[in-house]
């Protein structure tokens, strides 16, 4: 959908150094509709409070995560909640993120699936399941021990 500039990947590579295990981008300016921007901010606040996420933009899809980390993380989500699950499990495994500002562009291709009603319901359901598994039961931490 061309919402990120692939040339900015070099910024993430430069941020990956000793003491940093993975790099997550964060949108300098979100180029979405006002409604989508408001929903996005509410979502970020929600995940920071309820999931204790430490990065500022959990749904920025511009990341650099070494394969060795991905091999340790078992993902189960099949909706937009997968970004939250990925970041939460990486943080809880003790890995450290660096954050890099990246440009975010208006979608050039395709149509956002974000507000399709059945997808929203599926994501809300998966958020509830993730909260139960990752915050209440801490199932993933038992597997890491």
Predicted segment positions?
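Acceptor/aglycone-binding surface of glycosyltransferases and processive sugar-polymer synthases
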Residues: 6-80, 105-129, 138-142
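The conserved acidic donor/metal-binding loop of glycosyltransferases
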Residues: 1-3
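A short, conserved alpha-helix in the catalytic core of glycosyltransferases
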Residues: 69-73, 79-96
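Hydrophobic residues at beta-strand termini and immediately following loops
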Residues: 100
């Amino acid at each position: 959908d061309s919402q990120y500039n692939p040339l900015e990947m070099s910024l993430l590579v430069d941020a990956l150094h000793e003491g940093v295990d993975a790099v997550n981008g964060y949108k300098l300016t979100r180029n979405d509709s006002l409604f989508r921007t408001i929903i996005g901010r509410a979502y970020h606040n929600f995940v920071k409070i309820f999931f204790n996420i430490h990065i500022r933009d959990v749904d920025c899809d511009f990341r650099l995560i070494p394969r060795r980390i991905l091999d340790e993380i078992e993902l189960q989500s099949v909706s937009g909640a997968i970004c939250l699950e990925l970041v939460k499990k990486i943080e809880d495994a003790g890995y450290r993120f660096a954050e890099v500002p990246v440009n975010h562009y208006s979608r050039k291709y395709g149509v956002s699936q974000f507000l399709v009603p059945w997808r929203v319901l599926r994501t809300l359901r998966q958020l509830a399941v993730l909260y139960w598994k990752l915050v209440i039961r801490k199932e993933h931490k038992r597997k890491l021990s």
